[in-house]
């Protein structure tokens, strides 16, 4: 393997273009697997690591698990056939053999809506023992601003007797920006943010991602700013959806069609339209809003009350939609049976 942190710019480019750079993606789920396939498809040998042994066995048997992701089925078949991508549960074998370690791990909420970074912290502890000097770590997971600088680096470094960030290993972020069901399309059109602990590492990450993706790469001054941008874009949507949801409920009482209002309003050039509904389009936005609220709390701030209120509004919408359906069914003499709920 190469020592990516010690390469000159020309040596790095040659290593990338010749396919000598080895990639390890830790966490090959909904986003991690397409990410790994994109790197492999660019000519960089890639290994995916996951604790789900059934998933790993299925992948290595040639079975693509993400049937609802257009375009990646064919890429998967080709990468498996050409042996450019493999999967394993053995992180201890994969990490020491790779130059770049991508972290695409889940960051869910606990029962109190507090971000749970246990997966990232656990992998960080393993990297402390497994990471080879000269390697590069890139966090793609959506995390709170400051997590890399304040927690993850110290976990990987330990007592600094072997590893020292910015000295003999690099670390940065490139938050994923893709929606399930259209990941390949999003990877090909949505700009990516690049942040790192110093400019040299940011430039290395940019060169690697330019080889894999054709989108614009936007340089950020550091990791926390890049992560702040990712959260801000999603929390912005959550807040605006809450606003139109409350408008919709008000207009119901006044006999005004919210859709006609929005269609006319969006003819104004600076109006960014959002639509009411039972949810906000999946699990990511709620998680990101709670991450932002946790960030404010950790800063001993009472700010962002608007985010907290917006979450309450949007979380109440499924019941409101059910009540509207119930009214409609009762008026028509029919019954409505509520069986369960899922994120929408």
Please give the residue ranges for each predicted region.
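Structural/interface elements that position substrates and couple domains in central-metabolism enzymes
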Residues: 2-341
């Amino acid at each position: 393997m190469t020592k990516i942190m010690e390469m000159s710019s020309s040596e790095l480019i040659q290593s990338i273009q010749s396919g000598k750079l080895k990639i390890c993606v830790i966490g090959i789920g909904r986003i991690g697997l397409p990410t790994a396939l994109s790197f492999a498809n660019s000519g960089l040998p890639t290994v995916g690591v996951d604790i789900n042994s059934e998933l790993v066995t299925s992948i290595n048997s040639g079975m693509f698990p993400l049937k609802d992701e257009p375009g990646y089925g064919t890429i998967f078949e080709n990468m498996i056939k050409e042996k450019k991508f493999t999967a394993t549960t053995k992180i201890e074998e994969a990490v020491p053999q790779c130059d770049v370690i991508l972290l695409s791990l889940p960051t869910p909420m606990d029962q109190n809506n507090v971000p749970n970074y246990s997966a990232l912290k656990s992998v960080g502890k393993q990297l402390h023992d497994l990471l080879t000097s000269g390697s590069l770590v890139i966090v793609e997971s959506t995390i709170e601003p400051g997590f890399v600088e304040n927690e993850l680096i110290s976990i990987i470094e330990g007592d600094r007797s072997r590893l020292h960030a910015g000295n003999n290993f690099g670390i940065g972020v490139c938050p994923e920006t893709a929606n399930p069901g259209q990941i390949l399309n999003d990877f090909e059109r949505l700009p990516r943010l690049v942040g790192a602990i110093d400019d040299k590492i940011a430039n290395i990450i940019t060169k690697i991602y330019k080889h894999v993706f054709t989108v614009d790469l936007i340089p950020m001054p550091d990791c926390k700013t890049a992560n702040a941008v990712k959260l801000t874009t999603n929390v912005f949507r959550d807040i605006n959806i809450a606003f139109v949801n409350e408008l919709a409920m008000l207009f119901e009482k006044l006999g005004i069609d919210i859709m006609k209002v929005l269609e006319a309003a969006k003819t104004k050039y600076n109006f960014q339209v959002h639509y009411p509904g039972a949810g906000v389009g999946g699990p990511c936005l709620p998680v990101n809003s709670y991450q932002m609220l946790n960030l404010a709390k950790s800063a001993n701030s009472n700010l962002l009350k608007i985010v907290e209120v917006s979450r309450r509004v949007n979380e109440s919408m499924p019941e409101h939609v059910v009540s509207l359906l119930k009214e409609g069914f009762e008026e028509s003499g029919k019954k409505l049976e509520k069986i369960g709920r899922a994120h929408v």
